[in-house]
Regions:
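PRPP-associated nucleotide enzymes
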Residues: 5, 9-231
Length: 231
């Protein structure tokens, strides 16, 4: 009851830089239910597909907030006036768990460049860990829109470390963080560490972290569910 009350208070205080897409009922809820459900999530194809679907929904919602310019398109019967993105974002994902969400984002923003970053936890004790960023492949990121995806925003430390590593490739014009599940603790850390204009888009917000920094109720290990148990 205490965690639920804390979550309700936190959600009430959210500013417009945090978008919780579970606040209103939509088909997103079905995909969220399936990635969480222990009777469904062990099908890796279905799990990856649902992460892709969640990312597509987030991408569509983000697409409403970026800048467009009007163009003329010649059809077989005449001229149509349409809108085209003024600045294609760069889609950045955290390996390996973020790959499925990256595919969903790329399906929506299909003309975009991509960047890939490895970030993992090294546990020094059951409750303590360090974040390592060892691999980064990216285009020029200076003055560009970044969309950084990862299924789980648990502590926020990986996201912050990845953001800081990406700064070697340039400073962003705008940052979007796209995740399936986030915690209040992670949201607060990311908001303190990233630019004030950074937006966090999440499929849900869960109130609790275990002593090992796993989200409750969460869904388990997204990378293992999507791509197999690592050793």
């Amino acid at each position: 009851m205490g965690n639920l009350f804390f979550l309700l208070i936190f959600i009430h205080k959210l500013n417009n830089m945090v978008r919780n897409l579970s606040e209103k009922a939509s088909i997103l809820g079905q995909y969220m239910a399936e990635i969480r459900d222990v009777n469904i999530q062990n099908d890796p194809i279905r799990f990856r597909t649902n992460l892709e679907r969640i990312a597509e929904i987030i991408a569509y919602e983000i697409s409403k907030t970026v800048t467009y310019h009007e163009i003329e398109v010649k059809t077989p019967l005449g001229i149509s006036r349409e809108f085209r993105l003024t600045d294609d974002p760069v889609l950045i994902t955290i390996l390996r768990a973020g790959l499925a969400m990256h595919n969903g984002l790329l399906r929506t923003f299909d003309r975009c460049d991509s960047a890939f970053v490895s970030a993992y936890r090294e546990h020094t004790s059951p409750e303590e860990f360090k974040i390592h960023v060892e691999y980064l492949a990216a285009p020029n990121l200076d003055n560009r829109i970044w969309i950084i995806s990862d299924p789980m925003l648990a502590t926020g430390r990986s996201m912050v470390n990845v953001y800081n590593a990406l700064l070697e490739y340039g400073k962003p014009k705008k940052v979007y963080v796209a995740v399936s599940i986030a915690t209040p603790q992670a949201i607060e850390l990311v908001q303190k560490s990233l630019p004030p204009s950074a937006e966090i888009w999440t499929g849900a917000i869960d109130a609790e972290l275990t002593a090992e920094s796993y989200i409750v109720p969460g869904l388990g290990d997204a990378g293992d569910l999507a791509y197999g148990v690592k050793v």
